[in-house]
Amino acid sequence: MFPSWSTTFVLCMGLCSLMNGALAQYDEGASIEDFEFRSACTTANNVCERMADTCCPGLQCIGCNPLDPDDDGHCSCQ
């Protein structure tokens, strides 16, 4: 049948405490250098330079066409 409300509550609280512990361990591993890097890699309006690696990890500086004479070299992090 269905578990009682008290059993459901205890299971939920147990899972919540496990998740909080996992998040705390993740945060302990992050250093101030990691935080500074993540802050520094955020670009204004997702604009990046073609020749500079300013996008955050997981994003690429794309949207430029170096063969286009009207291309100003500004791309977007996507």
Swiss-Prot record:
Expressed by the venom gland. It is found in: Secreted. It comes from the Eukaryota. Keywords: Disulfide bond, Secreted, Signal, Toxin. Residues 1-24 form the signal peptide. GO terms for molecular function: toxin activity. Disulfide bonds: none annotated. The keyword Secreted applies. Contains 4 disulfide bonds. The keyword Signal applies. GO terms for cellular component: extracellular region. Belongs to the scoloptoxin-13 family. This is U-scoloptoxin(13)-Er1a.
